[in-house]
Regions:
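Short, surface-exposed ligand-recognition loops at beta-strand->loop->(often short) alpha-helix junctions
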Residues: 9-19
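Feature marks short, surface-exposed loop/turn motifs that line or immediately flank catalytic pockets
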Residues: 12, 43, 74-75
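Carbohydrate-binding/catalytic loop surfaces
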Residues: 43-55
Length: 129
């Protein structure tokens, strides 16, 4: 399994549409082998003082999100990149409104997922007005 990490710059006014676009295209991505896709936004709550601190946050007006996806293999991901279905998805106003950094691939070399625990606490915060 591989995990792909990509920073994306989504203007604040486009964030709801971007998240909806991800969800609307979920089925198609799953048909092409995606295992999961998460969109991460920097939390206002950061580390306690006794731990290493993150750098200053980005502007409150616009900022970066991180998109994390998982695929069964490099071949599965490469097949997705080459499919005309992906080309159709990226030919949209929502996709063009976002700034994309390069994708970095990571091989999964260890760890675990507690799926029952994730299901029990899953909540997705709404964007503040």
């Amino acid at each position: 399994m591989i995990v792909c990490w990509r920073t994306v710059h989504v203007p604040k006014v486009e964030r709801d549409r971007f998240r909806a676009w991800i969800e609307e295209n979920r089925r198609l991505r799953e048909e092409h082998g995606i295992l999961f896709e998460l969109v991460l936004g920097r939390s206002a709550r950061q580390n306690p003082a006794k731990t290493l601190q993150p750098s200053d946050p980005e502007s409150g007006e616009e900022g970066d999100l991180v998109v994390v996806t998982a695929w069964a293999s490099h071949d599965a991901f490469d097949s997705w990149i080459e499919t005309p279905d992906r080309d159709r998805l990226t030919d949209s106003d929502v996709h063009r409104s976002v700034g994309y950094c390069p994708i970095t691939r990571y091989d999964v070399v260890g760890g675990y997922l507690n799926l029952d625990g994730i299901s029990a606490v899953a909540e997705f915060p709404k964007e503040e007005p």
